[in-house]
Amino acid sequence: METPNPSAMEVNLETDQQVQSKDKPQRTELKRGLSARHMQMIAIGGAIGTGLFVASGATISTAGPGGALAAYAVIGLMVLLLMQSLGEMSAHMPVAGSFQTYATRFVSPSFGFAMGWNYWFNWAITVAAELVASGLVMSYWLPDVPSWVWAISFLVLLTVLNALSARVYGEAEFWFALIKVITVVIFLISGTLMIFGIFNDSPGVQNWTAGDAPFHGGFLAIISVFMIAGFSFQGTELVGVAAGESSNPRHDVPRAIKTVFWRIMFFYIGAIAIIGTLIPYTDPNLLRDSASDIAYSPFTLVFERMGVAAAAAVMNAVILTAILSAGNSGLYASTRMLHSMALSGQAPRFFGKVTSHGVPIYAMLATSAVGALGFVAALVSEDTAYTWLLNVSGLSGFIVWLGIAACHWRFRRAYVKQGRSLDELPYKAPFFPFGPILAFTMCLIVLLGQNYEAVFRGQLLQVASSYIGLPIFLLIWLGYHLVKKDRTVSLDEMDVEGVTITPEEA
């Protein structure tokens, strides 16, 4: 990690004057310090976390091993198409605002405004959620220490990591992600050996045929698991945000899109298959999907059956790493999003100021403060206010994915209509126009069907709690449109000019 000089925290007050027009690719003082290995691990680390280590057991319990596999495979296909769309735009136009900038330029300023604030709030509240989870995890070892002590300690750690430079963030995320990857690889190898009876008697395929397996609950159960699977994959879009500080985005972004996704899918599909084979879906421990129930993580259960005495302690440490990784990435992503909006006039302009190391310091401190307030809300509200905050941000990732598909659809059409050659693009999404259309449709189905049971039962409070994020997004979009009286950018007028990386930036 690089060590900042004494002036590292000196704020550069020239940022705004050095930024181009908001209708052009933005030149900022962000430093392109993320290497290819950073980009690879940011993409991997964004998708491997508590969704795999903890919540995967609940998906098998709900839909059976076959249903869980089907759900993750379908959501994985959707994410592949979305990441191909994002990769095409990010390699051509690598800016820290990513899809917020694309939404503003390829759809309308009001859509970009809503996308940006939606994404910023999502990750700011995610930081708060990870602070809450960190206290639960640490209580495994030190139950007498108040959770707020750990929350403050980890918030300070994450703030310092993000305050130094993008390279320090990338280095921290590289090692966080590497720990998670090593854990999954060991799990896959050990689980495979167990299936073949190396450590104990093999269960064979009996857990795939017991009861109404492999598709417990039928089609509706698979639909209900889609949302859990979708949440598990959220964070893969971080590679688009990080492209704005990649040292070689034309090469590193396509490489991350092409290779990392398949590794992630291998990890998820392999882990679900092993858990479903070794643990029956009727095991009540699979239903416990809270970070505080680490002894019942499906990974812990499998390692214990292998004879690892300290399985719970080991997995607790890994999950703490996953929590810190998510908080680290959340603070980074939301900071860059707020910074980008400030430069385009969609947030207070002082959030565009950066330090001499290229860190949007005011945007980062504001995001840290919101994360801290979210944690306080969880402490004092007996989870009521905090739960609603989580629900508001819960749909944000899916809304962003919808926006990515819509932006790519319009970008490619405008690019071709303006007479440009697709050969000039550093990376071309291979399944256009089928890809973004299918991804948009699938994502919309998952978003609207996330709590269909409450809708059918007429449970209005649960419906409002589950879907509140969607009307808030639409109100922000409509409100900005009414105030600014903007319009949808036509294909002929759309600015699809790419971003050229100068030697000074690289």
Residue locations for each model-derived region?
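Membrane-interface "cap" regions at the ends of multi-pass membrane proteins
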Residues: 1-57, 61-66, 80, 84, ...
